[in-house]
Amino acid sequence: VIFSSYHFGEQHFISKSNSKDYLLSLYYTSYGMLIFSMIFFSSQEEVIIIVNEITNVFVSNEFLNILFYSSIASTIILSFVMQFKKLITFNFFEEIILIILLFVIFNIASLIAGFAIYFIIWHSIPSLRDQIIELHSEFNTDNLVLYLKNSVLYWLVSIVSLFVLYYVVNDEKLFISLFFSFLAAIT
């Protein structure tokens, strides 16, 4: 979760940062942990079961609450530090609105649906754009098509494997645990 938190935070802010300062890594991790803690906070009972099934460790509601509130506090404090030190430039108001919107989505949707909405819309699509720029120096239609052609087989194998796993396991609770383990591995 910590590595995935860093990854999510980095992807969100990498284009907004202009430094290699070590504080950025802390900020990326804090922001990503805020995203995870909002998901965990919004679906506590399911998260407790899934974490227990995956790790055989029991996490309590109290732990999830502390994680949530401490993630809010650390992200707010570090946001001000980032702005003050001019390590990242972003619109604080826009980020607050985005976080509130995500929190509402996580509270309305199921655990999987909420995570999927975040993962696809707020993480994967911007990440694909960043990957295309990294691989081809710019984002344009030709480079997008080239990227999609090179990736489609990998994506199809992954999706087909996930469906096969779903039917082989034939246990929804176990599948959800495997699904989140799979997502953690690819992140």
Language-model regions, residue ranges each:
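Membrane-interface helix-boundary motifs at transmembrane edges
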Residues: 14-25, 81-96, 135-144, 171
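Hydrophobic, membrane-facing alpha-helical anchors
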Residues: 59-82
